[in-house]
Structures are given as C-alpha cells and as structure tokens.
From Swiss-Prot:
It comes from Arabidopsis thaliana. Its main location: cytoplasm. Functions as a holding molecular chaperone (holdase) which stabilizes unfolding protein intermediates and rapidly releases them in an active form once stress has abated. Functions as a folding molecular chaperone (foldase) that assists the non-covalent folding of proteins in an ATP-dependent manner. Molecular chaperone involved in R gene-mediated disease resistance. Required for full RPS2-mediated resistance through interaction with RAR1. Possesses probably ATPase activity. The TPR repeat-binding motif mediates interaction with TPR repeat-containing proteins. Homodimer. Interacts with RAR1. Interacts with OEP61, OEP64 and OM64. Interacts with POLL. Interacts with HTD1. This is Heat shock protein 90-1. Disruption phenotype: No visible phenotype under normal growth condition. In case of infection, plants are altered in RPS2-mediated disease resistance.
Length: 700
C-alpha cells in the first residue's frame, strides 16, 4: 500500500459520530438500509452518465449491489458497481465537509428523534458506526485510481492509494468490522429479512453471498482413485453403508458459495393498485424517501391514451426540515423511462409548491437519453406535469374527507397550498377549496371558503377577511367592530403568506374578497334612517377632519368619518390597492426589497374617525373653540400613534410617542410641566414634530 494520509473529521461530524457510537439505539438495523440506499444512488448516477456515453460502463458493465458476510473475519461488506468516488470525493464527502443536515440531525437526535431519520438529513453513511467499530471504504471512480478510506471514528480517518487490493473495476466496497454484540448481521436469514423489510424496492439487483451445503455419495473405490484433496468444503460422514456387492459407500458434505438474488419484486408501480397491500405501499414509501414513518396518503394511477405513464404519489405525515430551502435541489419525484431511472430532482415535473409530494413517474413515451436541457422543451413532460398536479389536488381532497388527517396535513403543508394560489393561476379555484381559516364565528375549528359562503347573511355580496400577525392580534381589532356588530363573519388570515395569496385570489365563487382594513368597505344592510344620521354626523365632523389633516400633514392621505368602527376613537386604513399594515410589516422584514416600491405602496393611509366616540366628540368641541389649542395637537398626535399600533403598523419614533404619553400622565396627575423643564428638554415641539415627520418614512 502507498503511504496513508490522515485527516481530521470536521467538528460537527465528529460530534455526530460520538452521538451515534455512545448512545444506545434499539433499531441499529437501519444502517443496512442507508448503505444500500447510498449504493442505489451511486448506481443511478453511473447509469445516467452511461446513457450518453456507453464507455462509462467499461470498468464494470454490470450494475449490482452485493452483500458479503464473512463470519471468520467478523466483517460485512456492501459492494456496488456505482459511480465510485475520487480521492477528493472521499475526503470531502466522508469527513471534512459537513452537510447542511448534520447539525439539524444532531439537534433532532438530542430532542429525542429516532436515529432512523438519518437518511433524510443526508448523513446516512455514518449509521455504519451503529454496528461497526471500524469501517473501510474501497472505491474506484472512472476518473481516478482506487483508494481506501479507513476510520475507527476516533476523530480522524486515513486515505490511501490502493495498490495491493483487489481491483473493483468501478464502484465502492464498504467493509464493516462488526462489534462483538452485532454479529447477528452476518446471518443470512437476518440479512435477507432486512433487505425485504427496507430495500425490497431498490431498482438494482441485490445479491447475497450465500453458503450452500450439499451431500454427495461416493464409493470407496472412487475415494481411493482420487488423490486426497485439501478441501475444507468436504466433510466425511461417519455413517457407512454396505452395498450388496460388498463395496462401501461414503456420504460427503460439500460446502459451496453462490450469489443469491434477494429483491425479486417487480417495480410496485407496474402492479395493479388493488393487488398492493397497505404494508407494501408503506415499505415502498420508506425505501423511496428514507422516512421512518408511514405516509399520510397515497395516489397510485396510470394515464392512458395518446400519452401513457404510471405514477405513485405520496404525501408525508410531516414537512421535512428544509422544505423551503431554495438552495437544496428538490428530490421529490423520481422520473423513470421504461423502468430505467433517469433523475430525481426534475423541476419540470412538478411545480415548486408541491415539492413536498414524493413519488415515482414511469413513462414509456420519453426518450431514454433525455437530458435536463431537453426536458425543458419536452411537450410530453408538460402533459405529465399537468396530470400530476391534477392528481395531487384530488389526493388532498381525499385527505380532507378525514378531519383528523386533514388537520395534520394542513398544519404541515398549508403554506404550500397558499404558495400554489400565488403561483398556479390555472388551479387557483381548486386550491382555494382546500384552504382553511379561523373566523369570528368558527370558534376553535377552522372553516373553508365553501362553508363561509353557506353561512353568509342574506344580501351579503362579499367575503370579509382581516390580515394580521396572529389570531390574538386580530380578534379584537377595531376594524372588526361594526362587522361583528352587524353579524358578518370575518376570516382571520394570520399567516404571512396569506397576504400574497389573497392578493392573487381576489374572489371565490363569484364573491369578492374584501379586506376589513382597507378603504372602500361597504356594508349593504344600512337603513335609510341610519344613512341620514351618518350623513349628518359627517357634516358636523367635517371641520375636525380638516384640522386633523392639517396637524398630521403628509402622515395620512386623508381624514374621513368612519362607518366601520363602533367603540374605538379612530383607526388607520390603507388604500384598496396599497399594502395592508401586515404586508408592510412583512416587507420591512425582508432584507432584499425594493425600497422605492415600499415608499409608494405603504404611504397611502387614511385616518377614519368615530363620530360616536366620546374622545372624538370632546376633541371636536375643543378644536371648534380654538384649533391652535396645544392640547388638541397633542391629542391628535397621540390618537394617530395609538391608531398606528391598534391598526397593526409600527411606530417610526417610539421615544417621541413615549414622551407624549408621559406628558399626558403628568397632566392627569396634575404635575406642573414647568417644574421638569430640563427633563422635558428633549421633547420635540409639536409643530416641528409634524413638519419633521411629515415625510412618510420609506419602509426601508
């Protein structure tokens, strides 16, 4: 062997290894599933490369996975003829570069998660140390020489050029030196059961090196004629039998070895759905996704006609840890062409919002040598995609029939559905049927648009909703006062993505979606008398509206008498086409935003005042007596700033607001302001205040 180079494990990988080695796990058997799954991935890669360049298979034309238990040396080897690894791959992939999932997996483990989740985090190789004290990886890639990686997980590993070892041709051989209490994994029966349990549906042949004992009878003469063989495979039976002719016969046991194919199942998607058991679907799902739990729902179908393909789609029980990690290639639907695996992160096959759906698609119509580039232009793929989306929505509707299952599904994937409303204009209406919201009338349950429509008041033309940070924040919002009083139901949209979704949805079942926080809210059930009364009130408050607008300047676009609030003195509404307060909050939180757009979209605020509120009535009287009264200006600023808060906006200058409150407290407590002039020295003058803040600060 050439000289060995020693490398230190990256810190996180080292921590992971010590967790795996020093913690007791009951289901250590998953190591085999993980290593076979890695072998299958390596075979996928070389098969895909060979579609465009046949010579890639020259080193080893056969594609296989082999398991070799060796009882005398207490080793189990997993051999594949996959793509293999170069020296750089060995160093990087097995030790010096931590994958994004390493840290997350450790956190999950420490939080009590099951070790069998390891494959989902991309660190399945290290599960070998659940059963092995030492691991040796021999590998040969077409572009490099054969190398050996070795480690006892003691903080470092060695990599050596393999000059003496048996040439692999191409591929990887992982040899596990089993711990003394893990020797069950050398038993043929145990290995067969494990492959059947976890890896039955791997699409490459998995062979086990098995031992066969046969009995053979030979006569004494034959025995003497043959030279004595040093054959450990022959065992002489003590039992001798005399034949009629007086010659003796001997029984000899012969031990031979052969490769036995263990996974004989044909691909599950080629079978009829009615022939497949729940358990088979569950086993296939687990081998496909590395999930340790069963799936929530499955859809198995075939499309026939001009285009033919078969598919199985699964919905997991929970969202993966990196569901919205845009840097990660989506490994959701595996694409096969005539049973040959082509690729598994094919973005053209399913839209991004359905990236949580797992499954396989097998088409007979696509060309075998299809590449990522030609996929984009492929018409067949567009038809497949359309069908997959349709079937996914059907599957979600089937889940919705069971309330408990749908609650689980909605908790995990509601954001995806809302993203679908935003992205998929063709299926917007169908996806809208799947949405659920809390409302002013739904209590602890969530309601659908469909159910909302059945409960609408007579003469109600619109669906009312309010957006905000949380259910608690919107429940007592001043915007809901009149709507609640008149018995209208209002949907609470409290997920950040709701803002984007409702911006695209606009209507449901011919009924417009109307925000309770934007101007233009019209309630149709007003009597003539109420209208008359409101007009009179508007007139009497006209001057106050002008005074408030003068004091606030550019902070608000206009000041009007409200017909949406009942108890609160005032509120701030946004323009019908501008951002809501909640949207403004969301946009402020985005680092990479267009600030010119922010200034334009967020500055259209209208102050609505409540003519029936005592504070407003008193303010009207004071303003009419003397509109330059200092207390009027102070009250208007204070009302504006509290309205910002109750309407869901944020304060640009919280210190000024606090100082204003303190001044009011002093007035209430009859403390003479002049005594504390110094203390209040920093308090800005109100007139300046208005001028200073008149330019609405951009949401920057």
């Amino acid at each position: 062997m050439a000289d060995a180079e020693t490398f230190a494990f990256q810190a996180e990988i080292n921590q992971l290894l010590s967790l795996i080695i020093n913690t007791f796990y009951s289901n250590k058997e998953i190591f085999l599933r993980e290593l076979i799954s890695n072998s299958s991935d390596a075979l996928d890669k070389i098969r895909f490369e060979s579609l465009t360049d046949k010579s890639k298979l020259d080193g080893q034309p056969e594609l296989f996975i082999r398991l070799v238990p060796d009882k005398s040396n207490k080793t189990l080897s997993i051999i594949d003829s996959g793509i293999g690894m170069t020296k750089a791959d060995l160093v990087n992939n097995l030790g010096t570069i931590a994958r994004s999932g390493t840290k997350e997996f450790m956190e999950a483990l420490q939080a009590g998660a099951d070790v069998s989740m390891i494959g989902q985090f991309g660190v399945g190789f290290y599960s070998a140390y659940l059963v092995a004290e030492k691991v040796v990886v021999t590998t040969k890639h077409n572009d490099d020489e054969q190398y050996v990686w070795e480690s006892q997980a003691g903080g470092s590993f060695t990599v050596t050029r393999d000059v003496d070892g048996e040439p692999l041709g191409r591929g990887t051989k992982i040899t596990l030196f089993l711990k003394d209490d893990q020797l069950e994994y050398l038993e043929e029966r145990r290995l067969k059961d494990l492959v059947k349990k976890h890896s039955e549906f791997i699409s490459y042949p998995i062979y086990l090196w098995t031992e066969k004992t046969t009995e053979k009878e030979i006569s004494d003469d034959e025995d003497e004629d043959e030279p004595k063989k040093e054959n450990e495979g022959e065992v002489e039976e003590v039992d001798e039998e005399k034949e009629k002719d007086g010659k003796k016969k001997k029984k000899i046991k012969e031990v031979s070895h052969e490769w036995e194919l263990i996974n004989k199942q044909k691909p599950i998607w080629l079978r009829k759905p009615e022939e497949i058991t729940k358990e088979e679907y569950a086993a296939f799902y687990k081998s496909l996704t590395n999930d340790w739990e069963d799936h929530l729902a499955v859809k198995h179908f075939s499309v026939e006609g001009q285009l033919e393909f078969k598919a199985i789609l699964f919905v997991p029980k929970r969202a993966p840890f990196d569901l919205f990690d845009t840097r990660k290639k989506l490994n959701n639907i595996k694409l096969y062409v005539r049973r040959v695996f082509i690729m598994d992160n094919c973005e053209e096959l399913i839209p991004e919002y359905l990236s949580f759906v797992k499954g396989v698609v097998d088409s007979d119509d696509l060309p075998l040598n299809i590449s990522r580039e030609t996929l984009q232009q492929n018409k067949i793929l567009k038809v497949i995609r359309k069908n997959l989306v349709k079937k996914c929505i059907e599957m979600f509707n089937e889940i919705a029939e069971n309330k408990e299952d749908y609650t689980k599904f909605y908790e995990a994937f509601s954001k995806n559905l809302k993203l679908g409303i935003h992205e998929d204009s063709q299926n917007r209406g169908k996806i809208a049927d799947l949405l659920r919201y809390h409302s002013t009338k739904s209590g602890d349950e969530m309601t659908s648009f469909k159910d909302y429509v059945t409960r609408m008041k007579e003469g109600q033309k619109d669906i009312f909703y309010i957006t905000g940070e949380s259910k608690k924040a919107v429940e007592n919002s001043p915007f809901l006062e009149r709507l609640k009083k008149r018995g209208y139901e209002v949907l609470y949209m409290v997920d950040a993505i709701d803002e984007y979704a409702v911006g695209q949805l606009k209507e449901y079942d011919g009924k417009k979606l109307v925000s309770a926080t934007k101007e233009g809210l019209k309630l149709e059930d007003e009597t003539e008398e109420e209208k008359k009364k409101r007009e009179e009130k508007k007139k009497s408050f006209e001057n106050l509206c002008k005074t408030i607008k003068e004091i606030l300047g550019d902070k608000v676009e206009k000041v009007v008498v409200s017909d949406r609030i009942v108890d609160s003195p005032c509120c701030l509404v946004t323009g019908e086409y501008g951002w809501t307060a909640n949207m403004e909050r969301i946009m402020k939180a985005q680092a990479l935003r267009d600030s010119s757009m922010s200034g334009y979209m967020s500055s259209k605020k209208t102050m609505e005042i409540n003519p029936d509120n005592g504070i407003m009535e008193e303010l009207r009287k004071r303003a009419e007596a003397d509109k330059n009264d200092k207390s009027v200006k102070d009250l208007v600023m204070l009302l504006y700033e509290t309205a910002l808060l109750t309407s869901g906006f944020s304060l640009d200058e919280p210190n000024t607001f606090a100082a204003r409150i303190h001044r009011m407290l002093k007035l209430g407590l009859s403390i003479d302001e002049d005594e504390n002039v110094e203390e209040d020295g920093d308090m800005p003058e109100l007139e300046e205040d208005a001028a200073e803040e008149s330019k609405m600060e951009e949401v920057d």
